[in-house]
Regions:
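Amphipathic, Lys/Arg-enriched alpha-helical "gate/interface" segment within cytosolic domains
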Residues: 1-124
Length: 124
């Protein structure tokens, strides 16, 4: 799986790292793994670092992923920041944010990791 993650409870953060080609199955696997992780507690915020990844995913699959992310919100996940450098990854992430916001997910995408980190820290 080209997506790994770590939970830093003391920082209130889940950080996921995506590399290579990422597909819907990878994202679904990430969500399932986080949901099953005993370190996942309410109040965490998430950073999805996709700077070194390229997506291979359809809009319909993005909508399905957004729907599954709602399970994380129901368990107490806060806002989600996405860091994306390539134009393709950025466009796909922007599409995801539109779909996710439509169902109540607080998410945004950034080209710079520092901007994503700063946004996550606001109001924390």
């Amino acid at each position: 799986m080209p997506i790994t993650y770590k939970i830093a409870s003391e920082q209130g953060r889940i950080t996921a790292f995506a590399t290579g080609i990422t597909r819907a199955d990878d994202l679904h696997g990430l969500i399932r793994a986080i949901l099953a992780d005993p370190a996942f507690v309410p109040g965490l915020r998430a950073l999805y670092d996709a700077r070194y990844a390229e997506p291979d995913i359809t809009i319909m699959q993005l909508a399905e992923v957004a729907g599954e992310v709602r399970q994380l919100l129901k368990r107490g996940l806060g806002r989600i920041a996405i860091a994306a450098e390539s134009d393709t990854t950025y466009r796909v992430a922007k599409t995801f944010t539109v779909l996710a916001r439509a169902i109540g997910i607080d998410v945004d995408v950034f080209r710079e990791i520092d901007d994503a980190e700063a946004w996550l820290s606001k109001g924390a």
